[in-house]
Amino acid sequence: MAYLAVLPEAGAAVAGSAAAHWLPVRVVGDGEAVLAFDHAQFVADGVARTQAKLEYTALATAFLPPQFTVNALRQVYETVWDTRLDRGNFHRAVADARKGFLTAVEGETVKARRFQAQLFRRRQGLEAAGLLDHPVRRS
């Protein structure tokens, strides 16, 4: 049995020995890091499950603080899916008032490059594991 945790930031690894430490998931997937027994398969299964859940749940918001920009959310999708997404199409998919799963935080912006970026939060009543009305597609 294996458990998958999704965190905005990982704390210090604590275990019974000094050998416990965090690794980027790519290092495990590429075979750079050797894990005992079939633990690499556990990681691969967890990554595949997370990639799939991003399409039909609000799970990506669990990687972020409560208020975030659409660009930060897109970076989560791009990182987990290991692919580039069109900025405009992505913004429409997640922030559209009829189809999206985000709510703009009124009057809240952050400086982003040369402009102010609107802050968003997950739609009220929608948990990270909650199903989306309209899926977010990888392509």
Residue map of PLM features:
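Alpha-helix initiation/capping motif
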Residues: 32-35, 83, 109
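Short helix-coil junctions and helix-kink-helix linkers
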Residues: 76-84
